[in-house]
């Protein structure tokens, strides 16, 4: 029987094979064949690949205003280092020299990244397909705007922006929606009875919707609640939190890495309890399951956890992954913490600091 090279196979069969190859591997293969490159750039193939390819979670890290795609070993205790796979290079369209823009925040949904720049601009990018779309404002963006990237039940992607119009009254805000189909903004409503503290303004995206910790007053411990935004109805809903809250704990939000679910860490003086939302109804009713409890006294290093901490939950390995919060120069970038483990993950560059870590599932789908 004659052996056949994959490039000689019928196109339908090649599509079927490549649609099951992990995204990052497929991107590396693009340069090996012009035929494959054309195929991988095709929107029909991207949709087929999104449905069939295995989902391998990586991390997005924001370091010194640059966005990196990285992988992390959750098991190695000694000499564990961040493995940088690639860098997202966003060229400034307003610069004659195509300088890179400085990124100050990143939001993630379905492999797309919504980035805010230091000079208050907004851009959506897919690091794998290399698509980039600059989002023009209805009027202008402001430093303390709150953004979220999501999608409706019919898979229409949208951006939600909260605009604080009284600087000294954070509970008074307009909110508006950018629709990718119409490429335009429209004002949807006003907010007057709650606010999202600036230290918690980066929401968590799960199944197309976004969640924050919000408050009805400035006493964040006694009045915090979970707030969700439904991109289908374009409305906010309060979601019930787990626990009895009798001791005024500090809350922090996270997302599971594998099958995305919203998580809440309840931070007490001596321990941390992590809960996973198994279901969230449109009414805000939620069912929670306790995932992990970590006794801080059992760890060899005291860990500083706050309501503005940025962390992820890995269900398979039963650990938390969070960025180092120290303000002094250090090689330590991440901590991996479980019931019986505490691992430090280093980076070779001790000058850089990680200001954000986001779970990322690569996709070839175009913006």
Curated annotation (Swiss-Prot):
Domain F-box span(s) in chain numbering: 3-53
Organism, scientific name: Arabidopsis thaliana
Family annotation (Gene3D superfamilies): 1.20.1280.50
Official protein name in the record: Putative F-box protein At4g10190
Highest rank taxon of the organism: Eukaryota
PROSITE patterns hit by this protein: FBOX (PS50181)
